[in-house]
Every structure is written in structure tokens, then in C-alpha cells.
């Protein structure tokens, strides 16, 4: 079934020893509307409810969030306390809290968009047990205010979302993730610790376990095949010709939702202007735009006010939109991990979707320059030369992928 299980635990469907009678199935149906769990979800949830640390590595759209949200409800009902969810993106936590509240689950977030008064109120309510889940960024954990709250509150679980951010070998290393284990060590009682990510190589998995100090975790690695996605690579012959190909593709798929990834902000602006000039409702997203514009573009795309998003890889983690029918890459990504994560935004509803990569030898030079300017981390544990060699190895894998798929026959959706 494509699932590997390490340190498997026995099934635990309820907290019988604590007088807990609410069945897992009833909770699943009542709050989330599902009749059953997917393969892999059950094992992770059983592990959490048995008091075990867990690590879930599951592809985009496989239902990672449910693996901690459902047991959080079960544990809160059993009097175990609140679940802290550590998320790297403000937009992601806002979307998830909104969805949870709409489902009748009491959840809140704390981030820089709130006033000091709102933060104090949220922490007060969490301490009183009014919330099942509390979402925070990793940077929040080390503040005196949050440490004071965590030292007094009853915490059932600490969940680390996008856990690959803890590894320098991953594509989205975030130094603040390295402080999570120290935060957990400061708690008066160690809660269950769960970690989830969509993409992680063996070395990244080892880093997650080691850097989070997971204790003999139940580890689930599901298969990464997405049979509803059709992949192809086409030759990018020249600027104007490629632009016409992209424009014609979007026109052929009028009314469908799509994402176009570009390697540089300059290309994002160029492709975005091309689409808008031709009457296509397109948004743009890159680090050079204001936070307000990025937020507005993401919301407009999420709620189908825009049909196309043109973006750099800054538009990546946590994009919760199920009906994306295509993902185009105007440039080759730096690694297969990046490509899998970005292309994986398509077809999350299980319907057919297409992933097209426009490849040019020029992309190799662009990516080499981007890697040369990549800011090296301050962690002395890994040599900069090792990191550069690893980045180059990943780039070479990406190049081989493009060479192999170039000129392949079109997918059924082109017919």
C-alpha cells in the first residue's frame, strides 16, 4: 500500500481509562464530515492517542492536518489540554483557524497581525481551556509572554507543521525551528510531539527526529505517487515563443484555476503583465511585493476571484486550494523536492490535473547563480561546501529529470 511503519503501536480508539466514551469515528464525522480515515492517517492518530511521538511524511492533499486536528479534539475532550501547532506561515495558520472555527472547532492563532491586547486575550482564553488548538509561528515560542503561558497551561500536544524547515538539508530551512526542542524541554510536563511534512529525504527525516528530539516516534511514510497528475516537460525555445505557449495554454484552459511559477521576480512581472493585457484574471506573488498585496492576491486566488496566480516559490507552503487544474513552471526549479512540492499544488481534489515544465538550458545558469547567492546558514554543524555540493547534486537531479521527460507525448488533457 506504499506505507512504511516504524515502531507501530496498537490501536487506541478511545481514552477508556479516563472515562472517555466519544468514539473516534463519531468525532471524525461530526467535525470533519468524513466517514473513514485514509491509509496512514489511522496509524498516526492511533500513535498520538497512545501518547507516542509521531512523524508523518505524506504528500500534499493526503490529509496531514487531520492527523493532528482530530486527536487534538479527542485529547481536549479527555481533559488533556490545548494543542500548540507551530506553523511557518501566517497565511497558512489564518486559513486553518478559519476552517476549524467554521467546522465548530475552537481554534485561535497568535502572530504579528494581532495587537498586543488581542494576543493577551488569546493567551488568556487558551489558558482557560477555551481553545482546542492554538497556532503560532516558531519565533513566538521564545518570547517571555508565551513561555509564561506555556509554563502554566495544560498542553496535550505540540505539533510541528512543515517540519522539513528544521533541516539545513531541506529546501526551506528556517533557523527558528531549531529552537522548538528547547521550548519543549522547558515545559513542566512533556506533551506528545507530532511532526508533519509533505517532502523529506532520508537525511531530512533524520534531522527532524534528531533536532526535535522525538522519542521513538511512530513514523509513517506514505507513497508519493499522485496518479491524477500528468507531468510533462517541453522545450522553451525563446522568450516570445514561450510567452505565446503559456498564453495559449491558459486560454485553452479558460475558467480553470492554475499556478504559473517563475524563477525570478522579473519573470513574474513579465508573465503577469502578458496575461492581464490579454484579459486574463491573474494575480502575482513574490517577495518584492508588500505583505498587503501578497495577502490580497492569495485571498483572491483562493476564493476564485482570480483564475491564475503567477508567482515565485515564495508562493508555496500552505496553499490550501483543492481545484487547481494546472501548474506551469516557466523556469526549471532548483530541485526535485521544490518541483514536487510546487507541482503538488495541482489536483488536490483528486481530479485530473496537469504539471508542465518549460525547460531551457538557460535555466541551468539561472539556478546556478541563485545557488551562488544563497545565504549560508549560521549553523556550524554543516560546512558551507557540503551545503553547496548538496545543492549542486539536487540541481543535477532536476536537470536529468528534464532531459528524460523532454519531448514526451502530451497528456490526455491536451486532446
Which sequence ranges carry the predicted segments?
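Short terminal hydrophobic/aromatic SLiMs and anchors at protein ends
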Residues: 2-5
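Conserved pre-motif I regulatory segment
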Residues: 16-57
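Conserved SF1/SF2 helicase motif Ia
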Residues: 70-96, 103
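Single conserved hydrophobic/aromatic residue that forms the stacking wall/gate
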Residues: 407-415
Amino acid at each position: 500500500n506504499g506505507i512504511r511503519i516504524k515502531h507501530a503501536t496498537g490501536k487506541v480508539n478511545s481514552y477508556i481509562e479516563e472515562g472517555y466514551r466519544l468514539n473516534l469515528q463519531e468525532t471524525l464525522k461530526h467535525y470533519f464530515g468524513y466517514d473513514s480515515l485514509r491509509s496512514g492517517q489511522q496509524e498516526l492518530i492511533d500513535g498520538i492517542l497512545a501518547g507516542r511521538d509521531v512523524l508523518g511524511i505524506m504528500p500534499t492533499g493526503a490529509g496531514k492536518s487531520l492527523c493532528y486536528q482530530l486527536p487534538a479534539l479527542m485529547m481536549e475532550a479527555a481533559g488533556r489540554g490545548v494543542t500548540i501547532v507551530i506553523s511557518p506561515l501566517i497565511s497558512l495558520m489564518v486559513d486553518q483557524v478559519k476552517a476549524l472555527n467554521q467546522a465548530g472547532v475552537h481554534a485561535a492563532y497568535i502572530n504579528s497581525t494581532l495587537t498586543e491586547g488581542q494576543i493577551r486575550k488569546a493567551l488568556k482564553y487558551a489558558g482557560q481551556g477555551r481553545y482546542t488548538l492554538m497556532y503560532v509561528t516558531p519565533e513566538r515560542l521564545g518570547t517571555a509572554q508565551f513561555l509564561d503561558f506555556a509554563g502554566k497551561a495544560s498542553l496535550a500536544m505540540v505539533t510541528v507543521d512543515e517540519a522539513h524547515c528544521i533541516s539545513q538539508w531541506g529546501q526551506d530551512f528556517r533557523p527558528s525551528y531549531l529552537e522548538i526542542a528547547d521550548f519543549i524541554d522547558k515545559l513542566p510536563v512533556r506533551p506528545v510531539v507530532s511532526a508533519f511534512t509533505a517532502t523529506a529525504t532520508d537525511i531530512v527525516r533524520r534531522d527532524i527526529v534528531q533536532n526535535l528530539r522525538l522519542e521513538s516516534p511512530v513514523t509513517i511514510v506514505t507513497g508519493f505517487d499522485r496518479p491524477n497528475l500528468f507531468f510533462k516537460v517541453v522545450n522553451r525555445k525563446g522568450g516570445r515563443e514561450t510567452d505565446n505557449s503559456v498564453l495559449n495554454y491558459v486560454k485553452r484552459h479558460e475558467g480553470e484555476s492554475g499556478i504559473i511559477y517563475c524563477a525570478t521576480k522579473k519573470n513574474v512581472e513579465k508573465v503577469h503583465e502578458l496575461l492581464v493585457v490579454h484579459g486574463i484574471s491573474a494575480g502575482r506573488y513574490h517577495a518584492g511585493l508588500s505583505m498587503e498585496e501578497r495577502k490580497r492576491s492569495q485571498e483572491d486566488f483562493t476564493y476564485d476571484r482570480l483564475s491564475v496566480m503567477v508567482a515565485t516559490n515564495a508562493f508555496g507552503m500552505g496553499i490550501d486550494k483543492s481545484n487547481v487544474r494546472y501548474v506551469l513552471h516557466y523556469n526549471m526549479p532548483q530541485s526535485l523536492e521544490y518541483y514536487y512540492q510546487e507541482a503538488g499544488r495541482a489536483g488536490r481534489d483528486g481530479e485530473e490535473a496537469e504539471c508542465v515544465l518549460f525547460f531551457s538550458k538557460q535555466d541551468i545558469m539561472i539556478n546556478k547563480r541563485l545557488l551562488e547567492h544563497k545565504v549560508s546558514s549560521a549553523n556550524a554543524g554543516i560546512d558551507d561546501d557540503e551545503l553547496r555540493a548538496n545543492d549542486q547534486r539536487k540541481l543535477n537531479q532536476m536537470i536529468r529529470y528534464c532531459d528524460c521527460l523532454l519531448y514526451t507525448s502530451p497528456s490526455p488533457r491536451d486532446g
